[in-house]
Amino acid sequence: MSLNFFDQFMSPTLLGVPLIAVAMMFPWTLLPTPTNRWLNNRTLTLQNWFIGRFTNQLLQPLNTGGHKWAMILMSLNLLGLLPYTFTPTTQLSLNMGLAIPFWLATVLLGLRNQPTAALGHLLPEGTPTLLIPILIIIETISLLIRPFALGVRLTANLTAGHLLMQLIATAAFVLLPMMPTVALLTTLVLFLLTLLEIAVAMIQAYVFVLLLSLYLQENV
């Protein structure tokens, strides 16, 4: 039994070896490997069609290259909602490790391809002369804050949802022998919250990749 509510966010270890890498690679094993049997297997054909339609509708604003990153983040977020599982994307270090390199790549790409336009983002057009130093500092700070906002947003939303689910589940378990009716209502609230967390897990993965795509479009 957990000693406190935050134990669920501790990285699992086996013989002192962190298993966060295994937890991150697990969603890739769920992807089916294309074979010739797909041509005669109606179930796999239907599954492939559904995944394709779902991906196109949900990830339509994203470019094709961002689909796989959105799907892997979505898989990590959704698998973390299962009982007795670990959610790697609740770790701020992991999210910052994803956000900072991708953001830095967009900035360096803009400086290499169109340095004048990339630096021009730091100074809006028509700025009064007296405000130029202040606005350059403000725009530079807002540019540097972007990766931190990406990582903290993903971590905070998932962590808050997991904590709230654990609190409600604990309340339902404690109330069951004393007030079964209240415990049943609490379980219903937990079920509705789980549906909400599924939506949040999908939306947060989508927002993470969408913002990176927008940052890339600014510098291309």
From Swiss-Prot:
PROSITE patterns: ATPASE_A (PS00449). One of its GO terms (molecular function) is proton-transporting ATP synthase activity, rotational mechanism. The chain crosses the membrane at residues 12-32, 69-89, 91-111, 130-150, 158-178, 183-203. GO terms for biological process: proton motive force-driven ATP synthesis; proton transmembrane transport. Its main location: mitochondrion. The keyword Metal-binding does not apply. InterPro entries: ATP_synth_F0_asu, ATP_synth_F0_asu_AS, ATP_synth_F0_asu_bact/mt, F0_ATP_A_sf. Gene3D superfamilies: ATP synthase, F0 complex, subunit A. It is a multi-pass membrane protein. Pfam families: ATP-synt_A. It catalyses: H(+)(in) = H(+)(out). One of its GO terms (cellular component) is proton-transporting ATP synthase complex. Keywords: ATP synthesis, CF(0), Hydrogen ion transport, Ion transport, Membrane, Mitochondrion, Mitochondrion inner membrane, Transmembrane, Transmembrane helix, Transport. It comes from the Eukaryota. It is found in: Mitochondrion inner membrane. The keyword Calcium does not apply. Belongs to the ATPase A chain family. Component of the ATP synthase complex composed at least of ATP5F1A/subunit alpha, ATP5F1B/subunit beta, ATP5MC1/subunit c (homooctomer), MT-ATP6/subunit a, MT-ATP8/subunit 8, ATP5ME/subunit e, ATP5MF/subunit f, ATP5MG/subunit g, ATP5MK/subunit k, ATP5MJ/subunit j, ATP5F1C/subunit gamma, ATP5F1D/subunit delta, ATP5F1E/subunit epsilon, ATP5PF/subunit F6, ATP5PB/subunit b, ATP5PD/subunit d, ATP5PO/subunit OSCP. Subunit a, of the mitochondrial membrane ATP synthase complex (F(1)F(0) ATP synthase or Complex V) that produces ATP from ADP in the presence of a proton gradient across the membrane which is generated by electron transport complexes of the respiratory chain. ATP synthase complex consist of a soluble F(1) head domain - the catalytic core - and a membrane F(1) domain - the membrane proton channel. These two domains are linked by a central stalk rotating inside the F(1) region and a stationary peripheral stalk. PANTHER family: ATP SYNTHASE SUBUNIT A (PTHR11410:SF0). This is ATP synthase F(0) complex subunit a. It comes from Latimeria chalumnae (Coelacanth).
